[in-house]
């Protein structure tokens, strides 16, 4: 999933592709989440961080996530035909959008109880994802989140205030994709 971000961009080039066109892709890059089995989880996505949380929800329900102490690619083994486990934890999904231009709502509802916050109140709770958590009296032991930096900072503070574990995935622009050019460096203390 992607959004065309302007003229002359890579996303515009993607939008012009048709079935059968060939492209070279480097990925996936980065690290996934190590899921804590048995802990009630919030899966929280905002903006470009929404789609990765759908895949995490699917993986949790299929039992193909990496859990503490497992080998790094154990989830991949399950996807390639190993025995499929059951869901590793209960979860509530909370998604944040600017306005009514939401996406993937039906797909999230197929995975778990799903809640929406929009900045303008056009869908779900008016405000941010924390407002949706409070309005719906949701509780969890751990947060897995992906999205814009202000949302991640707020969730980190919320987790500390509620004595919860919090794992975040930062979606930042990256040039080379492997860390060589240092364009993707994020100061973790700023999150």
Language-model segments: residues:
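Reductase modules of NAD(P)H-dependent flavoproteins
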Residues: 75, 80, 94-191
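Short, charged beta-turn/beta-strand-edge "cap" motif at the junction between a beta-strand
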Residues: 27-32, 190
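Short glycine/serine/threonine-rich phosphate/pyrophosphate-binding segments
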Residues: 50-56, 151-154
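Generic structural signal for buried aliphatic residues
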Residues: 22-25
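Ferredoxin-reductase
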Residues: 1-19
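Short, Lys/Arg- and Gly-enriched loop/turn segments at beta-strand edges
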Residues: 10, 30-39
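Intrinsically disordered, low-complexity terminal tails and inter-domain linkers enriched
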Residues: 62-89
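Extended interfacial segments that mediate partner engagement and assembly in macromolecular machines
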Residues: 28-30, 42, 47-53
